[in-house]
């Protein structure tokens, strides 16, 4: 477990910024591993001249026990703080996120409106179809954690740095984030790009389908990834995501110039 790693902040030459939000339960959020999904994604965007922040969220990059002492409002507060910091120096801010990071990105878009120029989501989650999900409110009171799915990556030799267990109190709080996102989803009207893996063992495809069916975005696109699992930003389709994200930002900026 990697501890006490600062957030990643990269200064580009442009006055546009990108906020990259991470998945849950992952030490990748600490940007400790040069091959981590957050860092590589962020550096790719910085190479295109954008100022990038990839914040380390409370409870991330430490231990699952510490994660279990946090709630979704703690994670969101850090995302919001990073957004405010970017907005001080950047005329336009794009928000990108993987898995739970996608949930947080959607919530930020709902609350910040036209303060966000566009969204890029990778295998975003707004609900779960697990049969045991209805037991979570009760299980969290008696069991601290369940075994988790770690390294859902098709490409060999990759390590996302995930926690070996899912902290149940934090997972229960995540369901409240999903509820908040779903309640206000029609407020999302920014340009939207979603990358979805066809073979994802963590987030069901119904999540992306629901998001696209309910957002108010007139500019919304889904890109299907055929050679990656859940952590697609570290998988065989990573370059598709990196290049597609940069192209998306460039297109939106050109259309608004």
Where are these regions (language model features)?
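Catalytic nucleophile-loop/oxyanion-hole region of alpha/beta-hydrolase
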Residues: 63-89, 94
């Amino acid at each position: 477990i990697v501890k006490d790693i600062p957030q990643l902040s990269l200064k580009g030459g442009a006055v546009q910024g990108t906020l990259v939000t991470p998945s849950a339960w992952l030490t990748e959020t600490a940007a400790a591993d040069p091959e981590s999904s957050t860092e590589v994604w962020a550096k790719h965007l910085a190479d295109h001249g954008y100022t990038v922040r990839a914040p380390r969220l409370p409870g991330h990059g430490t231990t699952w026990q510490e994660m279990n002492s946090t709630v979704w409002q703690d994670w969101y507060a850090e995302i919001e703080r990073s957004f405010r910091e970017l907005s001080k120096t950047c005329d336009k801010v794009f928000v990108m996120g993987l898995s739970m990071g996608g949930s947080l990105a959607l919530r930020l878009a709902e609350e910040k409106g036209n303060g966000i120029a566009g969204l890029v989501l990778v295998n975003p989650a707004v609900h779960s179809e697990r049969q045991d999900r209805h037991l979570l409110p009760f299980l969290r009171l008696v069991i601290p954690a369940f075994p988790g799915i770690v390294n859902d990556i098709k490409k060999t030799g990759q390590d996302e740095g995930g926690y070996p267990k899912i902290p149940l109190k934090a997972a229960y709080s995540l369901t409240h984030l999903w509820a908040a996102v779903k309640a206000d989803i029609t407020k999302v009207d920014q340009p939207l790009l979603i990358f979805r893996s066809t073979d994802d063992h963590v987030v069901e495809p119904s999540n992306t389908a629901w998001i696209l069916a309910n957002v108010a975005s007139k500019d919304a696109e889904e890109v299907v990834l055929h050679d990656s699992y859940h952590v697609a930003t570290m998988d065989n389709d990573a370059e598709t995501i990196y290049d597609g994200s940069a192209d998306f930002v460039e297109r939106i900026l050109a259309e608004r110039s």
